[in-house]
Amino acid sequence: MAAAASPEGSPMEAYKQEFIKFMVESNVLKFGDFTLKSGRKSPFFMNAGAYVTGYQLKKLGEYYAHAIHDNFGDDFDVLFGPAYKGIPLSVVTAIAYHDLYGKEVRYCSDRKEAKDHGADKGNLLGAELHDGDRVVMVEDVTTSGKSIDETYPKVTAAANVEIRGLIVSLNRMEVGKGGVTTAQKEIEAKYGFPVASIVSMAEVVEVLHNHEVEGKVVIDDELKARIDAYYEQYGVKE
C-alpha cells in the first residue's frame, strides 16, 4: 500500500499510521453507535482506559514521545498528566522519551484531592515544579477542555512555569463548547499555548477506510458515510 497522505498533502508519518491501527487492535478506538457525555450520537468512540497491558503501555508511550518530539522538540523539562488518565500517560511517555531521544524529563500529575500529610503533601504528585520549568501537558483526548480548566491553575500556582503545549492522542475535530471551533482551538485561544495530537480523526478515516486491520475492514463505505454525516453536523466548518 502506498504511503498515506496527510490532509496537507504530505506523506503521513509511519508512526501515525501504526498508532491508528494500534488503537483499533487495542480495542481503544471503536466504531458503532455511541452516546457521548455531551449527548451527541457518535459512530465512533475512544476509551484510553482500554490500554491495560505492559506492551500496550510501552507502545503508547513511544507514540506520544514521537508526537511530542515532532511538535515541541526537546525544549521541555516536565511532562504533566492531569488525573486520572493522564498519570500513567505522563509516566510511560517520560520513560519512552528517554529511551528514544536520550533526554531525561520529569513527570508530574495533580491530585483530585490535596494530600495534607507526609513529605509529598499538596495538590501535586511526582516531581516538584520549579520556576522556569518548561511543561508539556499530556492527555488522552480533549473534547471540552474541562480537565485543563481544572489543572492549569494548579500547575501555574505551584511555580512560575512555561506551558509549552498540550498533546492528546486523538483530535476529534468537533466543535467545542463555543460551537464555532474545536475544543483544541478554544484551549489555544484561552490559554495561549498550542494543542497538538498524535493523529486527527481525518487521518484515522484516511488510513482505515476500506483497509483491513487484523483481517477485517474497519471503516467500510457505509460507516464512512455515517462518519461524514456526523461531521456535517458536529464538525468545524472551514
Language-model regions: role of each:
Residues M1-V138, T143-E238:
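PRPP-associated nucleotide enzymes
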